[in-house]
């Protein structure tokens, strides 16, 4: 690794210099789940490969809306940025009308939400968001694709050269 010049260089720097068994940790149902530096990078690379498979190109926008700090947000951020796309972080407590405006104005192609409360508001306006192809949730919800489908889509490493 040369020097850290981009935000998504940090996990790689950490892996090389200070690898951690608990690089990130998120509490799910009262239990802390730790993610190692290597797993963080592996999942971010899978997200990158999946987004490329889904047709995301440099400068395309991917929105992330989370009610809390969580590991998935960090993984998505690195996965989005390292393929040259742009993460559009959106404040989780704005109105549905504000989501419509921000998602349209940013021309977001995909949206990742944390939970049902955010999903409800996004779905209220999803049909009015012209570039939006799909919404995924970090939480497992009945009426929404799960972000793990994206990670699984990126399991095939054939796009790794572009990452």
Pin down the residues of each PLM region.
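Anion (oxyanion) recognition and catalysis
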Residues: 81
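ANL superfamily adenylate-forming
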Residues: 117-163
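Structured binding elements
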Residues: 84
């Amino acid at each position: 690794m040369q020097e850290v010049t981009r935000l998504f260089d940090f996990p790689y720097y950490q892996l090389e210099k200070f690898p951690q068994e608990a690089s990130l940790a998120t509490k799910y149902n009262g239990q802390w789940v730790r993610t190692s530096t290597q797993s963080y990078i592996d999942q971010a690379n899978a997200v990158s490969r999946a987004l490329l498979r889904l047709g995301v190109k440099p400068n395309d926008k991917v929105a992330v809306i989370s009610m809390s700090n969580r590991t998935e947000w960090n993984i998505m951020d690195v996965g989005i940025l390292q393929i040259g796309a742009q993460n559009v972080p959106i404040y989780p407590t704005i109105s549905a009308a504000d989501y419509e405006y921000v998602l349209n104005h940013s021309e977001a192609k995909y949206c990742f939400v944390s939970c049902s409360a955010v999903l409800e508001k996004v779905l209220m306006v999803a049909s009015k968001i012209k570039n939006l192809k799909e919404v995924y949730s970090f939480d497992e919800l009945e009426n929404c694709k799960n972000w793990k489908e994206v990670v699984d889509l990126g399991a095939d490493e054939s796009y790794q050269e572009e990452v």
